[in-house]
Amino acid sequence: MTGWVLVALLAAADPAARERAGRASALLSYVAGDYAVAVGPRGEILSPEELAEQGQFVREAAAELRASSAEDLAGELDQLAGRVDARAAPPEVIGRAQRMATLIAQRFDLAVLPRAQPDLRRGQRLYRQACAACHGPDGTPPPAERLPLPTRPVAFASKPDMSRLSPQRVFSAATYGVPGTAMPSFGDALTLGERWDLAFYALTLAHKGARERARGEELLRKAPRTPDFLQLAVRSDDQLRAALSRSGLSPADREAVLSAVRAAFPASPGRASR
């Protein structure tokens, strides 16, 4: 046990090891978010391409951890890769991927939450500078014939496309890039705070209706509690919808509240990010 603790402390102090561990954690976040698109609740294959990608991501994450002297965590990912190959039910694979991403973040002291409230105005400016060319100024990517890329960029303006994404996943993509796509890493070009600003702004693009947002703000003023930016950072729109389903609000009002909380932070405990 002492040996593993020493290895963990040395790895956490090694910038190269932290970078590799960050990529591993990001890969597992993709698996947690997309495995249910590849495999159905009874183990049926929904998308062979997605399933192959999920297995590849887990194995790449294991390789990153072995290069970071985290053989114990890599061994657990070998087991997870076997469960992906066996088409295990989504709750099992998603839960294990999330747990492993958390363990990696804890061991290597990764920044998985914003240190202060993100700045949406700065996020908008950064989005226009760094993201609009591929993802579109309003979150709708240009037609494929105008932008020939190996994969279609995420449509941030699409509610269905964005339903499973959290700011944390967008932050990971901006930090480490996305394997097999044209999405580069902005880890060196943007500060940690700027990447969080960008991630939070991207989640607003599927909620652009001014009337819907105004209705949501009205409802939030009557709410006894509202989520802060730390809670919003790790939750996808679908997770927020599930929480709102217990509120007694109509479906339209739930969407309005979701729009409002993505656009502002009514209960923010911090100051603007640096």
Which positions does each model-derived feature cover?
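Short, small-residue-rich loop/turn micro-motifs
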Residues: 35, 138, 174, 178
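Hydrophobic helical h-region of N-terminal Sec-dependent signal peptides
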Residues: 1-10
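Mature extracytoplasmic or organellar-lumen-exposed domains after removal of signal/transit peptides
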Residues: 14-120, 125, 129-130, 212-274
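Periplasmic/extracellular electron-transfer cofactor-ligation site
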Residues: 41-48, 128-151, 179-185, 189, ...
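Extracytoplasmic electron-transfer domains, predominantly the class I c-type cytochrome c fold
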Residues: 58-59, 79-88, 148-207, 229-264
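Short glycine/serine/threonine-biased micro-segments
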Residues: 121, 134, 175
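Gly/Gly-Pro-rich "capping" loops immediately C-terminal to redox-active cysteine motifs
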Residues: 43-51, 139-169, 221-224
